Amino acid sequence: MQEQIIRRILLHLRFPFSFFLLPVFLFALSTLPDIRPEQTLLLAVLLHLLVYPSSNGFNSLMDRDEGSIGGIERPPPVPIQMYKVSLYMDIAALSLALLYLEKTVVFLLSGYILASRAYSHRRIRLKRRPVIGFLTVSLFQGPAVYAMVVCTNTICIGSAAWWPGLATSFLLVGAGYPLTQVYQHAQDARDGVMTLSRLLGIPGTFLFSGLLFAALGLALGWYAWQLSARPTAAVTALLLLLSPVLLYFLRWAAATRQHPDNADFRHTMRMNLLGSTALNALFLTWSVLNHLPSHVR
């Protein structure tokens, strides 16, 4: 019985799902001229191995989903022990951040955890409200994480130079987030949750995400051309790596117009995996290009 509880807890923490949230972190690194390796690695561990999984587990506990959820096609019941596990993981993350990272990062990390709890908790349930739920996820998984990375590696003084990065990180999350809800309409309706995707409908969700993807493409193109040390190589990498993602999105959107049942768990997870892999590869490539010795450039 104890082993079964542990297996279920580990499953609902959804550690592999952190890969889908990695692009914002890597994007922020790709825009920085200098990096503090030890602090950056610690922040990456705190976010991707403690805070994100803790948020996943708490969300599963509150949702009590019986159908597919992000990363799990057939989720088992969530053990009640998940509440304490998620709490201890958050405490560990904040304690380590308080010891080794900037106070601003601790503040942002605390805000992320509180927003995550407010999003999922049955008594608050921000996810019930389509616009507020969308903004909560997009702002805290996007600009807040971007700011954490910047503040970990530079003097944390807000300036106009931050705005393009904050806006782009918002688009990185906001463009794809409604697509993760398209297969959960019936499940969300039973739970009394009106997500943005339910509000827009399946065709509206693809149109909305398509518009944000277009804005994201323009923002990334501007970054590649204006800020990269090797703009031609950066733009080439952008086109090569993101073209397959665009093609898949367009084909999937067309398929759902013909048969709405194609807005399902498996298509969504493929989109997540393809998009995250391409973006992670792109931002790693940009980081390498921006930190090559000048004689190599």
Model regions: which residues?
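Membrane-embedded alpha-helical segments that form the functional core of polytopic membrane enzymes
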Residues: 21-58, 105-117, 158-179
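Small-residue-rich segments of transmembrane alpha-helices in multi-pass membrane proteins
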Residues: 20-28, 77, 134-150, 197-205, ...
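Intramembrane alpha-helical segments
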Residues: 2, 76-156
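Acidic (Asp/Glu-rich) catalytic motifs at the cytosolic membrane interface
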Residues: 47-73, 175-197
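Multi-pass membrane catalytic core of lipid/isoprenoid biosynthesis enzymes
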Residues: 64-110, 194-228
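Short, Lys/Arg-rich, polar N-terminal cytosolic tail immediately upstream
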Residues: 1-10
